[in-house]
């Protein structure tokens, strides 16, 4: 089971890299993304909340032929919120971190699927 493997890896201090702007399951969290409602995956925030693993959004861009990874500020688990709201709050922060990276290097961000809810067809 994929989720169990991810949880085990994180609880043992391992690293897990996930795409944070691709709601492949189409059951993600609705966030504000560049001023419009968009769907982002709940997985990164949910895993961090369940395991207390640090969550760092990473954005990438190119400088010439070199790929540059930028580790954004850590997203803290908001313990003061109920569990369901924690994931939504953290996912909104992930979206905000991606907005910063995309604003700085829009030419290096590529949408592989519809992210904004207004662009998606019927579920």
Predicted feature residues:
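Non-catalytic C-terminal accessory region of glycerolipid acyltransferases
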Residues: 2-123
């Amino acid at each position: 089971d994929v989720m169990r493997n991810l949880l085990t890896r994180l609880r043992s201090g391992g690293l897990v890299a996930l795409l944070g702007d691709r709601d492949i399951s189409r059951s993600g969290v609705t966030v504000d993304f560049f001023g419009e409602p968009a769907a982002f995956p709940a997985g990164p925030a949910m895993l961090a909340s369940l395991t207390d693993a640090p969550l760092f959004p990473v954005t990438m861009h190119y400088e010439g032929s070199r790929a540059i990874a930028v580790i954004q500020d850590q997203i803290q688990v908001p313990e003061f919120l109920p569990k369901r709201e924690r994931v939504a709050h953290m996912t909104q922060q992930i979206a905000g971190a991606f907005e910063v990276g995309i604003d700085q290097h829009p030419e290096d961000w590529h949408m592989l699927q519809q992210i904004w809810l207004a662009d998606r067809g019927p579920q």
